[in-house]
Amino acid sequence: AYPAVDKNVPLYILGSSTDSAHLAARKGLPYVFAGHFAPQQMHEAIQIYKELFEPSEYLAEPYMIVCLNAVVAETDEQAEFLATTQAQVMVSVTRGRMQPVQPPTDDLQGILTPREFELAKQRMEQSLVGSEATVQAKLESFMQEHGDIDELMAISYVYDQQEQLASYKRLNNVISKVNNSN
């Protein structure tokens, strides 16, 4: 990276809590919420940012980006299976012991403690996981619940690179359909 002296580099507030939503709103800056690992506060943070936003020299209106986990496969079952890699990554972060991305498993409950399994379930509850039709329904529901989101950022920990690429292509199809229907 190079210093951006005399460049107009936009400043964003990146956050995963309501505190960051308050800061972004008060400063009149774009806000990026880390819903991929902090979904519990996402709804409240989005609401706070939009309701308390103060126009600034940077922005006249709020600009909201949300990052979500996304795994889109041919079937819901295949997507759920592939998403077990993502769940393992989340648990690894929580344990404080990052490890290489692990292959998906048919027995997630068998490799996690009951507490870790519940944590993974909670952290994945706002994720876009499923077939294209399922993810489209989830995304439309998300947009209806949260109103205007300016950008969606997706993260996808899929073990197999070809499956990951296919997942991103399917997600692109879904987003195109959702955008065309609005």
Whereabouts are the PLM-identified features?
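Internal, glycine-rich beta/alpha segment that forms the wall or movable "lid"
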Residues: 1-27
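Short, contiguous strand/loop micro-motifs
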Residues: 6-9, 125-126, 158
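Hydrophobic faces of well-ordered beta-strands that scaffold small-molecule active sites
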Residues: 11-14, 31-34, 62-69, 150-155
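Active-site-proximal loop/turn and secondary-structure-junction residues that shape catalytic pockets
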Residues: 37, 70-72, 158
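An alpha-helical appendage that flanks or caps ligand/catalytic pockets
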Residues: 41-148, 179
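C-terminal helical cap(s) of enzyme catalytic domains, especially alpha/beta-barrels
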Residues: 44-52, 162-181
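Small/polar glycine-rich anion-binding or flexible loop at a beta-alpha turn
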Residues: 154-162
